UniProtKB/Swiss-Prot annotation:
Cellular component, GO annotation: mitochondrial inner membrane; mitochondrion; nucleolus; respiratory chain complex IV
InterPro entries: COX7a (IPR039297), Cyt_c_oxidase_su7a-rel_mt (IPR017267), Cyt_c_oxidase_su7a_sf (IPR036539), Cytc_oxidase_su7a_met (IPR003177)
Topology within the bilayer: Single-pass membrane protein
Localization per record: Mitochondrion inner membrane
Induction comment: By estrogen and silica. Expression is induced by ATF4 downstream of the EIF2AK3/PERK-mediated unfolded protein response, thereby increasing formation of respiratory chain supercomplexes.
Biological role: Non-functional protein. In contrast to the protein found in other strains (AC Q99KD6), cannot induce the assembly of mitochondrial respiratory supercomplexes.
Name of the protein described by the UniProt record: Cytochrome c oxidase subunit 7A2-like, mitochondrial
Family: Belongs to the cytochrome c oxidase VIIa family.
The encoding gene: Cox7a2l
Main location: mitochondrion
Length: 111
């Protein structure tokens, strides 16, 4: 008699020899070809549908604006200053917190 683990009952159950020697989850590869997934669509659209997002693309204009070599890195004024200062404060605070945590972890407690 051969046994195989039943995923339904979560116990060993009797099985045929061919089932018992086939690992669960691994089955022999089928010889038939799988169906084609990426085929040419049968219905071709005559015009390309374009979505109107919120207007024209502003990326090229912003690239020219931010890549000007005028020696000034905060080009949009107060929002850039606030973002820069917040980022630097969080970075420094996180670094200090990590260093303190490493120091405390490296010092054993006396009991």
């Amino acid at each position: 008699m051969y046994y195989k683990f039943s995923s339904f009952t979560q116990k060993l159950a009797g099985a045929w020899a061919s089932e018992a020697y086939t690992p669960q989850g691994l089955k022999p590869v089928s010889t038939e070809a799988p169906p084609i997934i990426f085929a040419t669509p049968t219905k071709l659209t005559s015009s390309v549908t374009a979505y109107d997002y919120s207007g024209k693309n502003k990326v090229p204009e912003l690239q020219k604006f931010f890549q000007k070599a005028d020696g000034f890195h905060l080009k949009r004024g107060l929002p850039d200053q606030m973002l820069y200062r917040t980022t630097m404060a969080l970075t420094l605070g996180g670094t200090i917190y990590c260093l303190i945590a490493l120091y405390m972890a490296s010092q054993p407690r006396n009991k």
